[in-house]
Design a protein with these regions (language model features):
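Hydrophobic ligand-binding cavity/cleft-lining segments
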Residues: 18-70, 196-197
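A short, structured loop/turn motif at beta-sheet edges
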Residues: 45-49, 98-105, 129-139, 165
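Short beta-edge strand/loop motif at the mouth of beta-sheet-based domains
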Residues: 59-94, 103-105, 184-186, 190-193
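Hydrophobic/aromatic beta-strand elements that line small-molecule binding cavities or substrate pockets
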Residues: 40-42, 68, 93-99, 123-132
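Beta-strand/loop substructures that line and gate deep hydrophobic ligand-binding cavities in soluble
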Residues: 116-162
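Positively charged n-region of N-terminal signal peptides that target proteins for export
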Residues: 1-4
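Bacterial N-terminal signal peptides
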Residues: 7-17
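A conserved amphipathic terminal alpha-helix motif
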Residues: 8, 21-23, 146-197
């Protein structure tokens, strides 16, 4: 993936500078106000119909996004992702689909982890856009919007700058290696946390 960086808050620049070239998603971001956004892009080796399926169905999302999902493709339908099936707080329970255009875009409400309560209930949203590149590749852009000002918002911004980049890497892996093995993913995550502490 190619790395693009426009004006980022200092904290996001620090996070981006800590990533190796391999870890960096193709990302851009606006600094403040209504235009402030986390944006990541990737081109995956899959036809648009398959990319659409993994973003808009429960089973599809469970192949790359999280271990459990509840998605019903309808305006106001659920877009619920459960990152840790044993901890109901670790997901997006109660969040809804805002809009969609088949095989072009979907937007949905989003929240932050429970340890960021101000942002968790702050009303952000995500827009996923996709376009075919030939018959066997799809370009995907994820834009996370609705950011406000404040220290907790800045922390969440840094969190999601990395998080959406990680998600796009899993999306790419889904189409090169098959559905994500969540047991293996949890072990790798735990090992990573232990190395950092």
């Amino acid at each position: 993936m190619k790395y693009i960086l426009m004006t980022l808050p200092l904290a996001a620049v620090v996070v981006a500078s800590l990533m190796t070239a391999q870890e960096r998603p193709n990302m851009t971001a606006a600094e403040t106000g209504p235009a402030r956004a986390v944006r990541v892009e990737a081109t995956v080796k899959a036809p648009i119909s398959e990319v659409w399926r993994v973003w808009t169905t429960s089973h599809g999302a469970e192949e790359f996004f999280a271990e459990k999902a509840n998605i019903r493709l309808a305006i106001g339908g659920p877009y619920e992702i459960q990152f840790d099936p044993k901890d109901e707080r670790s997901g997006t329970k109660g969040l809804k689909i805002l809009s969609y255009a088949p095989e072009e875009m979907i937007s949905f409400q989003w929240n932050a982890p429970p340890e960021m309560p101000e942002v968790r209930n702050g009303g952000t949203w995500v827009v996923v856009q996709m376009r075919p590149e030939g018959t066997d590749r799809t370009h995907v852009t994820v834009t996370h919007l609705g950011w406000k000002e404040g220290l907790e918002w800045d922390r969440a911004y840094v969190h999601f700058t990395r998080g959406w980049g990680d998600l796009m890497k899993r999306l790419e892996r889904r189409f090169t290696d098959g559905p994500i093995d969540w047991n293996k993913e949890r072990m790798m995550y735990q090992e990573s946390r232990e190395r950092k502490s």
